[in-house]
């Protein structure tokens, strides 16, 4: 497998959760990582924990000028190259099927899908130079139905489909493409979506732990290990890797 030493990696949505854990792990392995996000104080907190190998850039992935600035910052921090792009930025979108609004659905696809497509497209020339990798963060919401989560699940299903087609299209250019499908992980995403309060979090996560074959929810670091594998594995492309503690198995305990 390819070494991460001196890799240049861009991670969107790096101010907390899975993105921050990816940055921490990759920097520990010798990479230079640029993290992006909308909340500067969150990015600065992650950078302070990791150190000088981590560079930050404030921006919104839905804005073309911000996406270009993310790439430019990463190239400058990484010695003029890009080895991997991790499309992690996303929001949790929940809306009952009989209450859809067009504005809500458009925002969901703009944030979770279109921004990742456009950033990946812009990164291709740089990744071709390094025979690098693109990783999308999907979800096991595409494997197990959760009522009310159809907007979120649909955007994540789009990323799975995109992974396969993009991998087929970019294979001859030696760019690998993969998707990670995490199970339940304790992140700010659920709190920002208003699914439950910080005080309720522990009880809610305990309630879903049993849906996983391994009987517990995961950590951002465990998901980051899966992302690391897709970046480093030189003969793996087009896969949707379930890093989910077995929630996708649909285990029932009678």
Positions of PLM-derived features:
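Active-site loop immediately N-terminal to the catalytic Tyr-X3-Lys motif
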Residues: 98, 144-150, 172, 215
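Substrate-binding pocket helix/loop in short-chain dehydrogenase/reductase
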Residues: 96-97, 104-109, 208
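C-terminal substrate-recognition "lid" of short-chain dehydrogenase/reductases
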Residues: 216-243, 248
